[in-house]
Amino acid sequence: MAVNLAYGPYGSGHDHPDRLTITVHALGQVICPDAGSWGYENPMHLTWANQTVAHNTVSIDGLSQEPQGRSRSIWAGERGEQRVFGVLRLFHAGDHLKAARATCDTAYEGGRLDRTVCL
């Protein structure tokens, strides 16, 4: 079993507003996939994939994380808005327990995301 906790910086317009999203893999399968991965030619890319709700993370008040926020533009991050990034607070790879914790206080003005995953 493996869990990916994505906390890194927002990577411009090709990235999605999904800090602290997780994907879970087990027995050679993705059992908790990122539902926000569609090709640019697919109409779901603009209406679904580019919104925080399409990912396995948290949204506040139904809004997407910055820099998307209230914007419907797929290039919201290209306008030089607030940099969004998470910080790895804990990483432990012990024999019996593996754990990671990350926080992000730049995805929402006045909000803080905090996520811990353990195996």
Question: Locations of the language-model features?
Answer:
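Catalytic and substrate-binding regions of extracellular carbohydrate-active enzymes
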Residues: 1-119
